[in-house]
């Protein structure tokens, strides 16, 4: 079974939030799980945004980032580097799913999941979940 996790769900593995334990259990149960290379930047941005908002402190920010980086280096997350074709696919998804208000990063995650052959898609974003379901993914919702 090929699984993909977007940044909204992946973040729950590093920051205690509602449904965090469920995401961890899901990830452990799916073995090799892919995420897009853009998650490296998006997750870093998420941590900084949460620190600035006062949701986490600088220590937790550093610890979460270090743990994530260790997981990336060890292969716990399979980073899908993609290609120009993923950007073209993401662009096309805006037209393919006209009733889903996809943001650019949402479309890129969906394109990456398709490109790496995922059949399962984990997200904590309702709009993303609906779009993934419309594309035929088995969606695992963590919101």
Language-model-derived ranges and their functions:
Residues 26-28, 72-74, 115-116:
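Short glycine-enriched loop/turn motifs at secondary-structure junctions
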Residues 19-21, 66, 107-110:
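A generic local structural motif
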Residues 44-93, 134:
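Active-site-proximal, substrate-binding regions of enzyme catalytic domains
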Residues 1-41, 46, 50-63, 135-138:
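Short, well-structured N-terminal submotif of metal-dependent ribonuclease cores
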Residues 37, 81-83, 143:
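Residues at the C-termini of beta-strands that transition into short coil/loop
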Residues 77-126, 130:
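Active-site neighborhoods of divalent-metal-dependent phosphate/nucleic-acid chemistry enzymes
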Residues 3-6, 102-103, 125, 137-143:
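Histidine- and aromatic-rich ligand-binding microenvironments
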